A protein has these predicted regions:
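S-adenosyl-L-methionine
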Residues: 1-124, 128, 165-167, 181-185, ...
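Conserved acidic-Pro-Pro-aromatic motif
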Residues: 180-287
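A short, compositionally biased
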Residues: 34-39, 144-145, 243-246
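Non-catalytic surface loops within mature trypsin-like serine protease
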Residues: 54-56, 142, 151-153, 223-225, ...
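General small-molecule cofactor/ligand-binding pocket signal
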Residues: 51, 134-136, 250
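Short internal loop-to-helix segment that lines adenine-nucleotide cofactor pockets
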Residues: 63-83, 130, 134, 143-151, ...
Length: 287
């Protein structure tokens, strides 16, 4: 019976794919409730076995894919032998794909601070036998030290460096800058994915040397202006910093659009002034 109900839920859910209906809180709450009660323990994603978090926060048991446009983009932009950083690796959806794309001659560094997520990330990497992945249970930010990290009481993707109504508890966790962590790395870094709940600005400030030394580094980051502000980052300053060192921006809005289109700072700030209930991804690439 549980499988039949899940199948009905899955078909109903797919009707709304590409509509961004998930931006609404009541929809997210309903999905969390249904996912918690109906989801399987694991799913297969492109040949990879993935154990899910308690509420299937990425809806992988429903969609079989997460952020389709971004998933397709990384397949085009990441190549065999590349070095990739997954900042905010969660339970490993992108980490596993990166590991396959870079192959045995490449390397993936996956950063995930939250303990339960980290254990699932480790389990998913190990069960798929990816020995080209390095797992790091640290926060990536603009300083090294111990920081307070707030754990969401609703799902596994809403953990933040600032306190909100969603926070159920907090933990102390080690923070690092990418400049410090990779100061002795001899290979170039090719690609960074950042999804850290508004912490992208601080993480960027902590990788100034890395950005300088890796001229062709490509970045995908979450664009959530309100989260940046709550992390004491001015969204415009963050974009201008990247623009100053040669980056152009491309919008990945998660709807049914097929093209990833260039967008200016002015257009971004006008289109997503606060993004209180919605966020997108940005592809940042030097011309």
């Amino acid at each position: 019976m549980k499988k039949k109900i899940h199948a009905i839920y899955k078909k109903s859910f797919k009707i709304f794919i590409g509509t961004n209906i998930g931006r609404y809180g009541i929809v997210r709450k309903l999905c969390r409730f249904l996912s918690y009660n109906l989801k399987p323990d694991w799913v297969e994603i492109e040949g990879e076995k993935m154990y899910l978090d308690d509420v299937d926060s990425l809806c992988l048991s429903i969609n079989g894919i997460h952020e389709k446009m971004l998933t397709n983009l990384i397949k085009k932009e990441i190549h065999s032998g590349d070095v990739v950083l997954d900042i905010g690796a969660h339970i490993g959806y992108y980490t596993l794909q990166f590991a396959n794309l870079v192959g045995s001659t490449g390397k993936v560094y996956a950063f995930e601070p939250e303990p339960k997520n980290f254990e699932l990330l480790k389990k998913n990497v190990q069960i798929n036998k990816h020995d080209n992945v390095v797992l790091i249970q640290k926060i990536v930010s603009d300083k090294d030290g111990i920081v307070e990290f707030f754990i969401s009481k609703f799902d596994s993707i809403g953990n933040k460096l600032f306190k909100t109504n969603e926070a159920g508890s907090s933990i102390k966790i080690e923070s690092t800058t990418l400049d410090e962590y990779f100061k002795d790395l001899k290979k170039k870094i090719d690609f960074i994915k950042m999804d850290i709940q508004g912490g992208e600005g601080k993480a960027t400030l902590g990788m100034k040397n890395l950005l300088k030394e890796n001229k062709n580094l490509k970045i995908v980051q979450e664009w959530w202006p309100d989260g940046l502000k709550q992390n004491h980052t001015n969204p415009e300053d963050h974009l201008k910093f990247l623009q100053h060192i040669g980056y152009k921006f491309y919008e990945i809005d998660g709807t049914i659009k097929k093209d990833i289109l260039p967008i200016t700072i002015e257009q971004l700030l006008g289109k997503y002034p606060n993004s209180l209930i919605e966020d997108i991804n940005l592809f940042c690439k030097k011309s």
